[in-house]
């Protein structure tokens, strides 16, 4: 049996819609990162962008397990002395851009400092509400919540 190395021209990328309402953030991000990289495919090739184009809707309705919504902290630095800032998922989800919780979770599950990972991340579209503008691509609906009972809360 020969090892298959797929060329970029031979890759057929699918469009996928995932409804994130009630989904656990970490489990959703892990699944999406795997699909973005193309590791769910039997002909996966590490140096080729084989992942799907993924659309996530209702990103403002994701959930955290336990008390992580209030107790978890996200840190970033402004670049100035003493410029460490912190925020919580609750503040972000209740704020102006709630989809950033899902975007950052997926981004942090992709490889770091990789041009291919940046290209794969650009195939992710996240929307806070139930509507998206990619109907022309005829995306396939993936029922993430029914894959495992641990994927949802409540």
UniProtKB/Swiss-Prot annotation:
SUPFAM superfamilies: Ribosomal protein L13. It comes from the Bacteria. GO terms for biological process: negative regulation of translation; translation. One of its GO terms (cellular component) is cytosolic large ribosomal subunit. Residues 131-154 are annotated as: Disordered. The keyword Ribonucleoprotein applies. It holds the Pfam family Ribosomal_L13. CDD domains: Ribosomal_L13 (cd00392). Keywords: Ribonucleoprotein, Ribosomal protein. The keyword Ribosomal protein applies. Gene3D superfamilies: Ribosomal protein L13. GO terms for molecular function: mRNA binding; structural constituent of ribosome. This protein is one of the early assembly proteins of the 50S ribosomal subunit, although it is not seen to bind rRNA by itself. It is important during the early stages of 50S assembly. Belongs to the universal ribosomal protein uL13 family. Part of the 50S ribosomal subunit. NCBIfam families: rplM_bact (TIGR01066). This is Large ribosomal subunit protein uL13. It comes from Maricaulis maris (strain MCS10). The lineage of its organism: Bacteria, Pseudomonadati, Pseudomonadota, Alphaproteobacteria, Maricaulales. The gene is rplM.
């Amino acid at each position: 049996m020969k090892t298959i190395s797929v060329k970029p021209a031979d890759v057929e990328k699918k469009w996928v819609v995932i409804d994130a309402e009630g989904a656990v953030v970490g489990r959703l991000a892990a699944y999406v990162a795997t699909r973005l990289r193309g590791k769910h495919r039997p002909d996966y090739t590490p140096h080729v962008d084989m992942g799907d184009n993924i659309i996530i809707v209702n990103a403002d309705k994701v959930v955290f397990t336990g008390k992580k919504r209030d107790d978890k902290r996200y840190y970033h630095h402004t670049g100035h002395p003493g410029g460490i800032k912190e925020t919580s998922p609750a503040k972000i989800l209740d704020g102006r851009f709630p989809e950033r919780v899902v975007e950052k979770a997926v981004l942090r599950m992709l490889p770091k400092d990789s041009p291919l990972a940046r290209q794969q991340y650009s195939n992710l579209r996240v929307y806070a509400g139930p509507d998206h503008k990619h109907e022309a691509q005829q995306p396939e609906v993936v029922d993430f919540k029914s894959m495992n009972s641990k994927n949802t809360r409540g």
